[in-house]
Swiss-Prot record:
Pfam families cross-referenced by the UniProt entry: Aminotran_1_2 (PF00155)
Residues binding substrate: 25, 137, 361
Subunit (UniProt): Homodimer.
Pathway: Cofactor biosynthesis; biotin biosynthesis
EC number(s) recorded for this UniProt protein: 2.3.1.47
Enzyme class: transferase
InterPro entries in alphabetical order: Aminotrans_II_pyridoxalP_BS, Aminotransferase_I/II_large, AON_synthase_class-II, AONS_Archaea/Proteobacteria, PyrdxlP-dep_Trfase, PyrdxlP-dep_Trfase_major, PyrdxlP-dep_Trfase_small
Record PTM N6-(pyridoxal phosphate)lysine, positions in chain: 244
Cofactor(s) recorded in Swiss-Prot or TrEMBL: pyridoxal 5'-phosphate
Gene for this chain: bioF
Name the record gives this protein: Putative 8-amino-7-oxononanoate synthase
Family of this protein: Belongs to the class-II pyridoxal-phosphate-dependent aminotransferase family. BioF subfamily.
Length: 393
């Protein structure tokens, strides 16, 4: 539909370009969920598009905690955390995150995206340097752009290139911040964290790792990439989300007491927004407690990932490349966006919900499968059978 004012007619042209490139997206209403099975427009589908990796978003303990918090504190925090929006629940959650992550302190934001934006823009500015993995999440990229620092992307997962860039540019800048996903959200691979930590120390650089997809999924206790690599707690900055494996909403930064105190005074996306709602805060706290009591949920997730990855490997026509880590993100490629859309359509017709992932989100189109601990072997077998019959030689 055309816009009324000529000042806005470019929007229609832009949308037409997006449509021609097969990049157009729109939300679809889920009428039943969350869980491994959902209903979409009346159709029952096996859900391979959720980031509810441990199946906690519908867990009774989280629901009970959220309801209790609403009964006691209401539906909203009613102010910014530095004014009237700080509750004991927030402090309890931050202390629980810090203990879980092994850091001195933590700070909870309204989303993981805002945690990255606020932290990056608080730590660096025009006189500084950012070196970022080229496959980083949008929130890291946008935070780097907004900071005003000089931004250089390094080849994905390549510490050698990162080292070369630091040798060339580090001495020309006041501060340096290295940015990387922990588990990369579209590829499911893991950053070379031990090398990144060593490089950051060598070049007197800060290191921020976004562990959004590693929190709750990596390590025996689900504490993330640091536990996976069995690294000691260092000065580097751990960022993540409460909305994936923890089944709630919000984001966090975990690190030294000085870092967290500084962010309370300088992170605009924390200072100038209403605090996380009591329900979301209580649900996230309940999730951490549940994971610590029942680490077998992580074991079940890993078993499901292994089962699907083994099945995809057996379908040789997929040319599936198995990751050396059992991350819950797996994918198969498509030649172009149109083919990815066609594949997703066929999967849906056969009872599988796995939407197409296309540019500009990723450079190469694909179907991404997000594995949950609550998937049954039957759910995974159904997906493998559909792929076996559809995927062209």
């Amino acid at each position: 539909m055309a816009t009324g004012s000529t000042a806005y007619t470019w929007l229609d042209d832009a949308l037409e370009t997006i449509q021609r490139a097969h990049w157009h997206r729109h939300p679809q209403i889920i009428t039943q969920g969350p869980g491994p099975e959902i209903k979409l427009e009346g159709q029952r589908l096996v859900n391979f598009a959720s980031n509810d990796y441990l199946g906690l978003a519908s867990h009774p303990h989280l629901k009970t905690a959220a309801i209790k918090a609403i009964a006691e504190w209401g539906t909203g925090s009613t102010g910014s955390r530095l004014l009237s929006g700080h509750r004991q629940l927030h402090q309890d959650l931050e202390q629980a995150i810090a203990r879980w992550k092994g850091t001195e302190a933590a700070l909870v934001f309204s989303s993981g995206y805002l945690a990255n934006l606020g932290t990056i823009t608080a730590l660096v500015g025009k006189r500084d340097l950012i070196l970022a993995d080229e496959y980083n999440h949008s929130s890291l990229k946008r935070g780097a752009q907004l900071s005003g620092a000089k931004v250089i992307n390094y080849d994905h997962g390549c510490p050698e290139v990162l080292t070369d860039l630091l040798m060339k540019h580090r001495d020309n800048h006041r501060r340096c911040l290295i940015l990387s996903d922990g588990v990369f959200s579209m590829d499911g691979d893991l950053c070379p964290l031990p090398q990144l930590v060593a490089i950051a120390e060598e070049f007197q650089s800060m290191l921020l790792v976004d562990d959004a997809h590693g929190t709750g999924t990596m390590g025996k206790m689900g504490t993330g990439c640091r536990e996976h690599f069995q690294l000691p707690v260092g000065d580097w900055i751990q960022v993540g989300t409460l909305s994936k494996a923890l089944g709630s909403l919000g984001g966090y930064v975990a690190g030294s007491a000085s870092l967290i105190d500084f962010l309370r005074n300088r992170a605009a996306t924390w200072i100038y927004t209403t605090g996380l709602s009591p329900a979301d805060t209580a649900a996230a706290l309940a999730a951490i407690q549940l994971i610590q009591r029942e680490p077998e949920r992580i074991v079940q997730l890993q078993l499901n990932v292994d089962y699907l990855a083994t099945g995809l490997e057996s379908l040789t026509k997929l040319n599936f490349r198995r990751s050396p880590i059992n991350s819950p993100i797996l994918w198969v490629g498509a030649a172009n966006p149109a083919m990815a859309l066609e594949m997703a359509k066929h999967l849906r017709e056969q009872g599988i919900f796995a939407p197409a992932i296309r540019p500009p989100t990723v450079p190469h189109s694909r179907i991404r499968f997000s594995v949950m601990a609550t998937h049954s072997p039957g759910h995974i077998d159904q997906l493998l059978e559909v792929l076996d019959h559809y995927y062209p030689n």
